[in-house]
Amino acid sequence: VIGHEPVGVIEELGEGVTGYKIGDRVLVGAITPCGQCRACLSGQWAQCGHGEGVEAVGGWRFGNTINGAQAEYLLVPNAQANLAKIPNELSDEQVVLLADIASTGFSGAESANIRIGDTVVVFAQGPIGLCATAGAKLMGASFIIGVESDPVRMEMAKRIGADVVIDPKQAHVVEEVKRLTDGGADVAIEALGIQETFENCLRCLRPGGTLSSLGVYSGKLQVPYDAFAAGIGDYKIVTTLCPGGKERMRRLMAIVQSKRFDPTPLLTHKFSLDQIVEAYDLFGSRRDGVLKVAIRP
């Protein structure tokens, strides 16, 4: 069973789970760390070692190593570390995207250590890239450039935080970014996962800049020596995966509750569980301005 962005109501509590009751409405992150291993205690929840050590991407369990959320019921592992109560003021729709895409996108901005006044370029304005754009704005970037060719996503990028959106089909992206930033961005966030955008991110940076990589790459990834100043340009490349755990979810809900971030425009379509094939057909074809779909049992 797939699905890793769950909001639900507690139907049953396992032994040792305290501070919750039947009927509580909760958000659970896409990453479900144990909270006790070396990775978790170091703040690297996505690399959870399930009690000890470190395991690459070990925190991603829903729909990967255990059954996921697109069902009537969901068993949450290490529930004490992963159940985040939803404030009464927030709807399911306001919080469901925090479980994965918002946490991931924001992490791209956080991992880059964006500073107040930085210039930032975000390649690809899909759901995660849009959240990276919003995260860059929250962290104090003074000028944010989105790179996207889809008209619906270009408009959403401007709505959510981009000052300028470059269409790569209409302009030379690297040249335009360098022109707009007086020589190169402080931070480039890669949210697509292909060689071309990774390389363009590097070429858009000023010397000493940071490339924050959110994309999941399926083939060989190369670092061109000229874009990397032969390794001596003080460039930084950082990678990240969606942080999880109840404290991460609490913090994200606090941002929504304070009205500093509204994820609901990204949730463009809703379906019942028995319409799931229709939902995936729409999502896969990117018709009708779809960004994210919600499935209710």
What are the residue ranges of the model-derived segments?
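Glycine-rich beta-strand-centered segment in the early N-terminal region that forms part
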Residues: 1-41, 46, 66-67, 87-89
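A general structural signal for well-ordered alpha-helical segments in protein cores
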Residues: 7, 71, 83, 102-105, ...
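Short glycine-/small-residue-rich Rossmann-like dinucleotide-binding loops
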Residues: 14, 31, 170, 192-193, ...
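Mid-domain Rossmann-like dinucleotide-binding core that forms the NAD(H)/NADP(H) cofactor-binding site
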Residues: 26, 83-171, 175-176, 187
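NAD(P)H dinucleotide-binding glycine-rich loop of Rossmann-like/cofactor-binding domains
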Residues: 34-123
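Glycine-rich phosphate-binding loop and adjacent beta-alpha segment
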Residues: 141, 158-159, 163, 194-261, ...
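C-terminal hydrophobic helical "lid"/dimerization subdomain
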Residues: 171, 179, 183, 187, ...
